[in-house]
Structure formats: C-alpha cells, structure tokens
C-alpha cells in the first residue's frame, strides 16, 4: 500500500513537470508587433512618424575634414577616407541619402495611410486635432526627405534629361515592383510642393499658447473645441520642436533655392524670383 501511494506521488510530480514544460513543445508566438496595434497605442504610431525625424541628416560628425587634404583617418575602411583617395563609388558614398531617405518615406507613407484610424485621445475633439497635427508633420517630413534625396541623387542623364528619384506616395509591399523608373526632377518638385501645401493647411504657423478662447481657429470651433486650453493641448508651446507651418515654409524656401540653382534651373520651372518669394514668406 505504501508503495502504491509513493507511485501516485511520483506520477503526479511527473505530470506537473510535463505540464510546466509545455512551452518546450509549443513555442510562444514571435514578439513581433502588428500594424493594427498602433490604433489604440498612439506612442507606437508616433514611432512611425518619429522615424521621419530620426533619419534626417543632421548628425554630421565634425571629422569630415578627412574627406579633404586637411586631415587623415587611420581607419582604412572609413568612407570619407575612401572618398578622398579616389574610391568614391555607388557602393562607397558617405554622402548617400538613399537608404535612410527611402526608408523614411516608406514609414511616413504607412503613417499617412493609417493616421486617421489611430485613437490619439479619448476626447474626440482632441483626437481630431492630434490627427491634423501629426498628419501635417508627416506631409512636411515626406517633403523634406524627398528634398534630400533630390539634392543627393537627382541629376542630368547623358541624353539631357533632368531626373529625380522614384516618387512614392503609397507604402510599398513585398510583392510590389521595385524596378520603378525615376520620376523627373520637376515631378518630384511638384510632389514636394504639394506635400508642403497640405502641411501648411494642417499645422499652426508657430506653436504658441492661446490666452483667449475667442482665438481658437474657426475650423476647430466648428467641431466643438471651445477653450484655449483644449487647443493648447495639441498646438500650444508644449509642441515646440516639432515641424510647424513656418518650418514647412522654410523647407519650401530650401527646395526652391535648390531648383533655381544653376545645377538644376534649366530642367525646372523654378527661378530665383520664386525662391526669393518663398524665402520672404518665412
């Protein structure tokens, strides 16, 4: 009888051990987050938008002198050293914006496709304002990333055509044709200007706090935003550092100056008069 009881305990212990090891036989799902998770998690959605900021070429190191005769790098694999010693090729281009620029535009296209579905706030009026604000930033960032792609990869062909880059306004999927031809430089300019126009409609000129409820923009009064405090929650000084309407106009000025320059002016409809007008707007 004592042996039977002992066997029962042994069997019970074994069953618990096997139950606790079920994960060994049934692997857990991969920890990959799906796109549908952005709808109820605004911070996740902002990660898509944030990529457009993070990949901008504003972190240039101070040691770029090694691309000239003024300094020398001891790192033989350094891209700037290769650039200075005659190895500047398509596979070794320290000034390239292709990978980061194209990736940024892909993320921004996904964001623009999904932004209206994101629950930015529990309050519906705040949700609509956040949607406008983030969408305006995305349009401006797409324009800015396309500008850097044009500046680095646009140019004249042997037969005298001024080409830009493939102009993408929809997210690419794994089944898409990636052999897209380059759009003309002017077509890329038109897309940039169009995106900046959209950004200007959605963003405030500057992120300043309103002090009077009567100053709430009419389009937001119409949807029920009644107080300056509600407006400031989305468009107030707390948002400084993000792209504003004025920054979008500054981007337009940069783009027009590039297009009107001697390098590109003969292939565009932009001249220095337009560049000056755009600069004056800022």
Residue ranges and their predicted role:
Residues 1-31:
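Bacterial Sec-dependent N-terminal signal peptides
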């Amino acid at each position: 009888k004592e042996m039977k009881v002992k066997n029962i305990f042994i069997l019970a212990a074994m069953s618990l051990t096997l139950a606790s090891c079920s994960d060994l036989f049934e692997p857990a799902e991969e920890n990959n987050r799906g796109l549908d998770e952005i709808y109820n998690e605004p911070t996740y959605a902002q990660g898509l938008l944030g990529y457009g900021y993070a990949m901008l070429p504003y972190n240039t190191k101070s040691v770029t002198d090694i691309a000239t005769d003024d300094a020398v790098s001891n790192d033989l694999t350094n891209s700037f050293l290769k650039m200075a010693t005659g190895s500047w090729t398509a596979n070794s281009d320290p000034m390239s914006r292709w990978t980061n620029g194209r990736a940024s535009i892909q993320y921004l296209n996904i964001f623009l496709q999904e932004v209206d579905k994101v629950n930015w706030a529990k309050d519906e009026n705040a949700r609509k304002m956040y949607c406008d604000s983030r969408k305006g930033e995305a349009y401006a960032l797409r324009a800015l990333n396309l500008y850097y792609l044009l500046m680095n990869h646009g140019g004249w062909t042997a037969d005298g055509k001024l080409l830009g880059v493939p102009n993408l306004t929809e997210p690419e999927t794994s089944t898409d044709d990636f052999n897209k031809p380059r759009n003309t430089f002017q077509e890329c300019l038109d897309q940039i200007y169009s995106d900046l126009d959209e950004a200007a409609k959605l963003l405030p000129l500057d992120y300043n706090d309103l002090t009077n409820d009567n100053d709430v923009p009419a389009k937001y009064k119409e949807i029920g935003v009644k107080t300056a405090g509600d407006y400031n929650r989305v468009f107030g000084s707390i948002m400084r550092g993000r792209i504003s309407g004025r920054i979008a106009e500054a981007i337009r000025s940069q783009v027009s100056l590039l297009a009107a320059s001697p390098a590109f002016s003969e292939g565009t409809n932009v001249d220095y008069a337009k560049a000056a007008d755009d600069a004056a707007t800022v």
